[in-house]
Amino acid sequence: MGFNSIFKFRKTSLSLLLFAVYFIIGILYFIDKTRYKHSLPIDSEGVALLDNAWLDLQNITNKCHPYSSKENDRVHDYLLNRIADIINKTSYAEVSDDYSTNSRALFKQQDVFNASSIASRIIYFESSNILVKMEGRNPVLKSLLLSAHYDSTPSSHGVTDDGKGIVSLLALLEHFSKVQPERTLVFNFNNNEEFGLLGATIFFEHEWSKNVEYFINLEGTGIGGKAVLFRTTDTSTAKIYQNSVKNSPFGNSIYQQGFYNRYIGSETDYKVYENKGLRGWDIAFYKPRNLYHTIEDSIGHSSKPALWHMLHTSLQLSKYIAELDNISLGETQDLSPAVYFDLAGYTFVAIPSTKLFWINIALLIIMPIISIFLFSIVKKYNNEIIDSGNIWWRLPISAMSSGTIIIFTTKLIMKWNPYILSRNFLLPLIGLTFEFIILNSYILTMFENLSSSFDFKTIAINEISFLFWIVLAYQTWKLYDNNYQNTGIYPFTICYIVMATAGNIGYLFLIFKNIEIVEDEEASLVQYVSNEQSTIEGRYRDEINGRDDSSRDSNSASIPTRANDERAPLLTNSVDNINQRTILKESKLVYNYDWIIEFLLVVPFSTFLLYNSLELIMDAVNQTIQETGDLYKVYKILAIGSILISIPTLPFAYKIGCQLGKTLTFISIGCLLISMALAPFTEMNPIKFRFMQVNDKVEISGVTTHDNNKLRDMINNLPSVKRDDKKVQCQEITKFSSVCEYEGSPVHLVDNMYRDKLKLMEVIVLKDDRLSPERSPYAPITAEVEIRVQENRMCNVYFGQNKERIREVNVSIIEGNDRNSSVSLRYRVNNNRNGIDELQLHKLRFEANSYIVGIKWMPEILMSNEEEDDVLPIKVECYWGEYEESSVEVGEGEVGGGAVIEYYDKIPSYSEILEYKPVDVVIANREKGLVKLTEAMVL
């Protein structure tokens, strides 16, 4: 009797089990997020590798080191020396330094950060990549490339992006310098990833690239946590990761689909290697993004456990690949996209997306057939159970009503505290999830009070199964339509399997319960009884008439009443007059424990899977609202996700007990109220503004806060703005972002021996034969422009009207007036319709102070040709990104005095903002540099 009472479908039993499920999910989540922190190496090699890597990280990242800075050269030299020390006694290792070999190229490149862009871009790039080749014991095997970039953004020390990747490569180099690998390894310590993935692109100009087949790219798009397998090229490479990374695997193909479908706007060197036909892995830190590309991406915000997770993951993977031959890696390669995920960091699953497609097809056909077959049997023998009252409409009405309230609550949060998700998305997620569950519990309980049902949970499970069938059918079609690249749909497959299986099991139990239905002429109460028909009829009549006959025999004690029946409504124990049939007979052969099987099938794993998937997505996108300002997309994910997490619980929601219901209600209200009241930005979770000084104007952009004054208030509080009474002008960029502009302080970008006489940038036309009488009207127009810049590495040239008629550009870099100091590189346009929109210039030598750009374009061939028809407007923009060192300026002293030496901040306006900004604000660069000087002209 006690056993039966515990495991029957009662409020207490259900509540305890549901609480246990939520508690276990919370524990698993906590373990998954923190276990890596307690997994530091204990073996001597691992300890040494980590200690050396941490010291390297400290040495590399003590200052910002973008490609445009002199500090970038210091990092290059440090790496070159460290590599030389590591491989000093390694006979099978060889170094190639692009800086020393003057590696450079002029090539066409699509905008790597905007896949929809159709702009024709030509890139001139001088490389300072450092390459190391470790010859394998078997030279026949294709090489493995290990890659990371050592440049940072101008506003960041680059600890995670990508210092950890670089020092992990040094650690791998140290490991393989002691044991020669079977397969040749090529290390690419590349430069200038941040503004075009250029170091990875020019790698393919090197002879060592010709034998490479596999690659591992190490990257950072957040500043800590665990290093995730963002994406991998195919199923075979996913299985290699599965077979090699046994300690703390972490990856999910949901992120891979995000890249495939361009939900993730940024890019890494992985894209370059993949486009060149290599096969490999993109391993990266991905959160938090609010400190990413800021001065806070520093040692102080990093940790050895985070570094070790990337280092150890890449070590496991590279050792596995390096020691296996092609046969061991698999002669039959599956090149289809992979579906993969880890289970709380304990194991890793990988299957082909094509296989998932056929699994889905089979499920979409077979499962409905089984369900329809079982349903028809239930309908034939126990039709009254599944056809009773409004049982089929309860869940849709309840879910839609609750969903409407969830949407309203979500909009309320977005209105009152829109950027709370940037700080904490778990609070609103938990609040909305429990709100949806409790609302459904109240509504479904009300339905049960009005019209008691025999087995609502089975009907509800099958309704949810049908919903997942529709979703899965659509996602399967999208999977096929997108060339099997929708690799993040596997949660719907798994949820449909468990829902359909549980629903069919419920139908089986209904079949074998052998329930008979007869009419009760005096009342229409539903009562579930044993075989004592006459006893029950008498008892029900007594209840209806308000009598309690205690003289019945002892058998009546085993008959369930409204007070203790597991199918009794939640809100009341009273007996209502309900117009429906009375169930009078149920076989004792099947006990009412089927709910446990259905619950364990439906709730625990589905809830954990859906929560884990949503948490991964929100972890990646919650702080992108500061970059894109797209609040609607992120809140839409939050609302839909909270509903999805709740769905597995809905069939059992009407049995949630009073105490658990109150607890969930209290938690929900508390989380939602805190979400609306909590400050969205703190010192550890700051708001990010982006800085750029364009000529003499400072432009700072950022998201629009609730009071719309944070950006303006910060600028108005700057000493220079108050002292000089500078006018601050702000305008809206999008609905959720704005840009403010004010007069900046003069920059001091270079050491100046002749104060006020040195021009930082000057554009001079050396040649232009557009109006020359010696040129035939049908001949191409040629022009040559010199861009004179001081201590500069990066300029862009934009072409305006008639840019589609440009047929050729050539670039040379000269030092002083020596035109023979550089060989010109030429690029010809083959497609007559495209022309050239933009020419990007990236040079290494600071002392080479001139870019010479030659341009050739076709004239407009018309009968009445006006002079203006053939003009070519150009705009030149040059960038500087170094600010931490002071500049020295020398001027004349007073009459009869000597020279006056003064020290200045290179970019005073930027230094001022870093000094006086609020603690809950961080600053990032807006473009390639912190300062941009521009000049326009017409050729």
UniProtKB/Swiss-Prot annotation:
Localization annotation: Vacuole membrane
Membrane topology: Multi-pass membrane protein
Residues bearing attached sugar chains per UniProt: N59, N88, N114, N326, N622, N810, N820
Active site: E193 (proton acceptor)
GO molecular function: metal ion binding; metalloexopeptidase activity
Keyword check for Membrane: yes
Transmembrane segments: 12-32, 357-377, 389-409, 425-445, 454-474, 492-512, 589-609, 637-657, 664-684
Entry keyword Manganese: no
Family as reported in the entry's similarity comment: Belongs to the peptidase M28 family.
Protein name: Vacuolar membrane protease
Organism: Vanderwaltozyma polyspora (strain ATCC 22028 / DSM 70294 / BCRC 21397 / CBS 2163 / NBRC 10782 / NRRL Y-8283 / UCD 57-17)
